[in-house]
Amino acid sequence: MMNILLINGPNLNLLGTREPEIYGNKTLSDIEKDLTKVAKEKSINLECFQSNHEGEIVDKIQESVKSIQGILINAGAFTHTSISIRDALIGSKIPFVELHISNIFSREDFRKESFLTDKAIGIISGFGISSYSLALEGIIGYLSIKD
């Protein structure tokens, strides 16, 4: 069975209440339940992890090296600031898809720079919560071809 890790960064625990005009009304728990169901239907084990703390995300990536085949990451604000998450992803050698609910390239200038994009196998951005299912499809397709 393929194991995929979903990582959500800071403030994504506030989905459903934080700026619903940008991020929608679904909670992170709703998104995780829906995505886990889709993964299970495809015989994929999806592990979900969220943290507001950069070091915890780095630790989770490092702990996953032997058990996870692919990572989906919505690093939130850490997308634009975290060299340590970038380095952990590179060091893990686990293929990853960067995802964002909003189109980060059509927002404030500081959100247009990602420290992850050039190392990701792909990026999904701007499709609302559908970005999660699109990213899952992308990583499954990539890993299926890779094997």
Swiss-Prot record:
Q: In which domain of life is the source organism classified?
A: Bacteria
Query: Which pathway does it take part in?
Result: Metabolic intermediate biosynthesis; chorismate biosynthesis; chorismate from D-erythrose 4-phosphate and phosphoenolpyruvate: step 3/7
Q: Where is this site: Transition state stabilizer?
A: R18
Q: Reaction catalysed? A: 3-dehydroquinate = 3-dehydroshikimate + H2O
Any one biological process term the GO annotation gives: quinate catabolic process
Q: What's the Enzyme Commission number for this chain?
A: 4.2.1.10
GO molecular function, a single term:
3-dehydroquinate dehydratase activity
Listed A to Z, the keywords are: Amino-acid biosynthesis, Aromatic amino acid biosynthesis, Lyase
The positions flagged as active site in the entry are Y23 (proton acceptor), H100 (proton donor)
Report residues binding substrate: N74, H80, D87, I101, S102, R111
* Quaternary structure (record): Homododecamer.
Q: Of which family is this protein a member?
A: Belongs to the type-II 3-dehydroquinase family.
What is the role of this chain? Catalyzes a trans-dehydration via an enolate intermediate.
Q: What is this protein called?
A: 3-dehydroquinate dehydratase
Q: Which organism is it from?
A: Prochlorococcus marinus (strain MIT 9301)
